[in-house]
A protein has these predicted regions:
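Short alpha-helical donor nucleotide-sugar binding micro-motif in glycosyltransferases
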Residues: 269-270, 277-282
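Aromatic "clamp/platform" in nucleotide-sugar-dependent glycosyltransferases that forms part
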Residues: 290
Length: 389
């Protein structure tokens, strides 16, 4: 049975049991200026659930320049509340049915939990891409960071330990078990790669490195530039292109000016076609991130036949298969590894071939099935879906 057929079957069985309206809670919406891989992940499974016959509402926070009530790819989007106020606002709205009745709930926990086990008495699941850990100190002042860490690792886990949980990273899977989640309630599945991201065109005539992502502290773009500068001591004509925007853009610009780094290009935000062109032309894609749930740009680049060099962290270990689809290394060694890949055509071709083959195995249809299966299990179990409450 194909993944599309599996998805239709699961949705049909849920509909037969009266479960049609599914609310999906997320901190940010795909149309938010700061949207990233988590938001893309949510859009991919929601659109497919909608196509399979479920009625999906995406509840999220306000996005600048976007209407409060909207629709995208067939499902409804409601954007109300600020970055922090959205959490209590949604809990109250769902408790008192201000957003209408619903039959099942999906909570996407991105640092701050929605605490749905406390107020939701419907079949529900949790999606958690990664534990933020050291990211708290990068995003907030120390007292606030300490509170965030405590909520994420000590206060919230006991509330969720009986909640079916989906993650994309095997490392996050292990972290959840360490925090007390039941092994039988945690599932792990890879993200997909859109068929749009495919090989084509010619590589640049000179050694070229690409980095894609929101320019935030956790992505460590300044450290990546430092590592590419190290690579340039042996590959002097190597260049680096940074695609994306964000709060660190000024810091990045200042570094470029201070080091007269004419070899760095800031491409800014680009559309889908331009992004694919960057993937296709570059010799390799690199990431110096401190933490990732997966690293979607790395597998999109793989779909275009471009291998990766990335930090050896949770998330990257799933998106990049070391010495197969790319190479993983500690941050201080990244420059040396980048230089090695740029200098060795045979190594680069081998990694590119494996990266492309694996990317073709990663589908969003399989992801949509993998996320729906635990919710389906809650709906169809004899207890009527009350086991996780």
């Amino acid at each position: 049975m194909s993944d599309a057929a599996k998805l239709a079957h699961l949705a049909s069985e849920m509909l037969e049991r009266g479960v049609r309206r599914v609310h999906v809670l997320a901190w940010r919406d795909l149309d938010d200026d700061e949207a990233g891989g988590s938001e893309n992940h949510a859009d991919e499974f929601m659109r497919r659930w909608q196509e399979a016959g479920l009625s999906v509402m995406h509840r999220t926070s306000f996005a600048t320049g976007r209407p409060e009530v909207d629709s995208r790819n067939g499902y409804d989007v409601v954007r109300r509340g600020g970055r922090m106020s959205v959490f209590p606002r949604v809990a109250l709205s769902e408790t008192f049915r201000r957003m209408g009745s619903y039959d099942a709930l999906v909570e996407i926990w991105n640092g701050v939990p929605w605490l749905s086990p406390i107020w939701c008495r419907k079949p529900r699941i949790l999606i958690l891409h990664h534990i933020h850990g050291p990211m708290w100190e990068q995003m907030f002042p120390r007292p606030v960071a300490a509170i965030g860490r405590a909520i994420e690792t000590r206060l919230a886990p006991p509330v969720y330990r009986r909640t079916p949980t989906v993650t994309t990273s095997t490392d996050t899977h292990e972290e959840l078990l360490h925090l007390g989640w039941r092994p039988d309630l945690v599932t792990t599945g890879p993200v997909g790669v859109d068929e749009f991201f495919s090989p084509g065109g010619e590589k640049t005539a000179h050694p070229s490195v690409l980095a894609v992502g929101r320019q935030a502290p956790v992505k460590r773009f300044v450290q990546l530039m430092e590592q590419v500068a190290i690579a340039r001591t042996t590959i002097p004509d190597a260049t680096l292109t940074l695609v994306g925007d964000g709060p660190e853009r000024k810091v990045i610009r200042e570094w470029i000016e201070r080091h007269d780094a004419h070899w760095v290009t800031l491409a800014g935000r680009v559309d889908r076609e331009e992004l694919r062109d960057h993937y296709r032309r570059s010799w390799l894609i690199a990431s110096a991130s401190l933490a990732e749930g997966w690293g979607l740009a790395l597998t999109e680049a793989a779909g275009c036949g471009t291998p990766a060099v990335a930090t050896d962290i949770s998330g990257h270990r799933c998106s990049v298969l070391h010495d197969s689809t790319g190479l993983l290394a500690p941050l201080p060694e990244l420059g040396t590894v980048i230089a090695r890949v740029l200098a060795d055509r045979g190594l680069r071709d081998r990694l590119a071939s494996s990266a492309l083959a694996r990317a073709r195995e990663l589908t969003w249809e399989a992801l949509a099935v993998g996320v729906l299966e635990p919710l389906h299990a809650q709906v169809t179990r004899p207890s009527g879906g009350r086991r996780n409450r």
